[in-house]
A protein has these predicted regions:
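Short glycine/serine- and small hydrophobic-enriched flexible loop segments
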Residues: 18-19, 94
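Gram-negative outer-membrane beta-barrel transporters
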Residues: 31-168
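Solvent-exposed loop/turn elements at secondary-structure boundaries
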Residues: 1-7, 12, 17, 23-34, ...
Length: 169
């Protein structure tokens, strides 16, 4: 797409690490990312729901075997709008000696505070896909969590892990 412009972004974060004792660590990071001129392909549903807005993405394709021309859609990358995501990353780690080894337990994740984007083709109509299937054909999960427990000795290491993403509508 010759009209494609580069994405630009503004981002910030602030965080802290708290270690009240040698075996316990807690960290928190609040972050925000804003993207302008996001590059993505417009979904087929959006193209067909707004044919006048995306008329330049319609074309015809000749099928040689049938000799017919059919309607086709070009799924080209375009600058579609703005995106803003904000969340909190956290990590809790506990370490302890256990028998002949060391047990490390971690709980880490992201809690998404905001995930929104402008309706394609606009600069001021915001939508969200936070915990739901959005018009951008994506889901932004509010909670993404991973827990691990690792037992390590001089001879072996065993890790048990679990991952979680909350449901969506």
């Amino acid at each position: 797409n010759p009209e494609l412009k580069p994405e630009t972004s503004k981002q910030w974060s602030i965080g802290t690490v708290f270690e009240p004792i040698d075996s316990l660590s807690m960290s928190f990071d609040l972050w925000n990312v804003q993207i302008n001129d996001q590059v993505t392909a417009v979904s087929e549903g959006l193209i067909f729901n707004n044919p006048s807005k995306y008329a330049d993405l319609f074309t015809t394709k000749h099928i040689t075997s049938t000799g017919l021309d059919v309607l086709a859609v070009k799924l080209l990358p375009i600058n579609i709008g703005k995106v803003e995501n904000r969340g909190i990353d956290y990590d809790f780690t506990h370490k302890m000696k256990l028998l002949d080894g060391r047990l490390t337990t971690r709980l880490m994740g992201t809690y998404l505070l905001r995930s929104r984007y402008t309706t394609p083709g606009t600069n001021d109509q915001w939508e969200t896909s936070l915990n739901r299937y959005g018009s951008n054909d994506k889901v932004s999960f509010r909670n993404i969590i991973r827990a691990t427990s690792t037992y390590e000795t001089a001879k072996f290491t065993h890790t048990l892990s679990a991952s979680y993403r909350n449901g969506y509508t």
